[in-house]
Amino acid sequence: MQPRIHMPLKIIMRLFYIVLFFLISSCTEHKINYYKTETPKINLNEFFNGKLLAHGIVQDRSGKVIKRFKVDIIASWKDDIATLDEKFVYSDGSKSSRIWKLKKIGLNQFEGTAGDVEGIAEGETAGNAFYFVYDLNLPVDDSTYVVNFEDWMFLMDENTLLSRSYMSKWGFDVGEVTLVMTKTL
């Protein structure tokens, strides 16, 4: 017969393993290939071509909406390089712009650059999804912070793209951006 002192230890160890399992499974990386069978299939050459209009919100890490914005985008391709000229207007009346250069480097692989992006952005498509990661110089008040962006874009129909961007700094979540882009005629 085992002493009774071991029974609580067994329960504690079981609880420890259950918690450890959930912690490990919650850290499982979101994979682009999960979406490879989803339709409609995204084709960046087709969607990012012509005029687009986007509306979005920025949320802080608690989920509070801290900014709303509209973006007018003019997109074009020359060979395997896209130019996305973005003009932002925020709910407080402020404005900004960004010009992305996207380069197709493989069947489903892309690289991107922009004036406020550190280094090279990396992207990949599968099914209806486009996964895009980069470090952005983000102005906040009188300072600029380098923030990691992890964009997940999903083609909803031939004219609509839904985007969720997760922002982090030193591995900690700092906010999210939700955006809907529509092609204009």
Language-model features, listed with the residues they occupy:
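Glycine-rich, aromatic-bearing surface loops/beta-hairpins
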Residues: 150-185
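Sec-dependent signal peptide recognition
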Residues: 10-19
